[in-house]
Amino acid sequence: MTKRKLHNNWIIVTTMITFVTIFLFCLIIIFFLKDTLHNSELDDAERSSSDINNLFHSKPVKDISALDLNASLGNFQEIIIYDEHNNKLFETSNDNTVRVEPGYEHRYFDRVIKKRYKGIDYLIIKEPITTQDFKGYSLLIHSLENYDNIVKSLYIIALAFGVIATIITATISYVFSTQITKPLVSLSNKMIEIRRDGFQNKLQLNTNYEEIDNLANTFNEMMSQIEESFNQQRQFVEDASHELRTPLQIIQGHLNLIQRWGKKDPAVLEESLNISIEEMNRIIKLVEELLELTKGDVNDISSEAQTVHINDEIRSRIHSLKQLHPDYQFDTDLTSKNLEIKMKPHQFEQLFLIFIDNAIKYDVKNKKIKVKTRLKNKQKIIEITDHGIGIPEEDQDFIFDRFYRVDKSRSRSQGGNGLGLSIAQKIIQLNGGSIKIKSEINKGTTFKIIF
């Protein structure tokens, strides 16, 4: 099916609506004007006919002259006087006036008739005349030539007005539709550019139409979300390719070792299988963390948000950690004030364990970790402090980047992927919080989480 252009369709529709509206309007106006003018012509004819009748009542018939009759007539009028026997007594008509023969026709026709003669319409009014010395009737012939000319002029004016109005409407519609469709054309072209070149540019439309500007803003927001989703997917692929390469190479190497020696040497088989399983577990954990970072539900927090009692959650997690790491000392300094926050419970547990796990990894000597909470200026503050190796100042701006490791020589042996702090930062930001870091080499690190 052939699709029509919105631009052309708009012009056609608006022009047709305008034309039909003007056409109907002109017809109504002409109808009322014709009726008014026709009634005016009829009134003039009847008035003249009445004046003729009054003339015959004012003086004897023998004293009435043609001059008297003409004085009672208006423009474009003639008069014929008949006696009661249909004999013509007076006539002011000429050769160009409609002929009305005496006899049956005008004896019995209605008082007012309309006849056409030589292309001109006439009104003929029959008026009885009865006086003391005369009995007959008059036929007043009123030409409608002037009326017809006025009506014709009205039709011509209406037609000219309709044509001019249609042309003006079509021109205005063309200009207006161009302004309306121009942003849509720009939108279409921008989509083509994005499909071809990517998300480098935004749609810039400066119009006087709120709807068009809202459309452009919505489009830009949609493109930003699509770009973010696209970048997340690309980042996931890049990160996965980068981090999966090493464990996959290790697994491949041990599988080759099993194929070559493991069939005959149980020790080699056992060792290679254990290492392969360990690397597979590392891959699974890595993929889970990558998926956590690339989730797109940034704005969908409130649907599962619950009231989290911070101090209660920390006490519960610390109790479990003491059982899991009996060689570590966990000190707590929790405020007596009730600290609450709206968020998904598993997210709070996840980010808290990320910081504790990070402290355990890098505090292998003193093995002393402190957790402190307080309320300041309506802000809920959580501080997690270790006494480990610390973070160099030049590294502190990058520790939340994906796969960034401060102690690069030890991170793989400690099982880290460099994603934990990135995940924690994302959770904190999604819930309207912020994070600060304070660290000194060989003295320890404090992470301050603020909600």
Curated annotation (Swiss-Prot):
Documented EC number(s): 2.7.13.3
Domain (HAMP): residue spans on this chain: 178-231
SMART domains, per the entry: HATPase_c (SM00387), HisKA (SM00388)
Top EC class for this record: transferase
Record field: transmembrane: 11-31, 156-176
Catalytic reactions on record: ATP + protein L-histidine = ADP + protein N-phospho-L-histidine
Membrane topology according to the record: Multi-pass membrane protein
Keywords annotated in UniProt: ATP-binding, Cell membrane, Kinase, Membrane, Nucleotide-binding, Phosphoprotein, Transferase, Transmembrane, Transmembrane helix, Two-component regulatory system, Virulence
GO cellular component: plasma membrane
Role according to the record: Member of the two-component regulatory system ArlS/ArlR involved in the regulation of adhesion, autolysis, multidrug resistance and virulence. ArlS probably functions as a sensor protein kinase which is autophosphorylated at a histidine residue and transfers its phosphate group to ArlR.
Record PANTHER family: SENSOR HISTIDINE KINASE ARSS, SENSOR HISTIDINE KINASE CPXA
Protein name in UniProt: Signal transduction histidine-protein kinase ArlS
Protein species of origin: Staphylococcus aureus (strain bovine RF122 / ET3-1)
Recorded name of the encoding gene: arlS
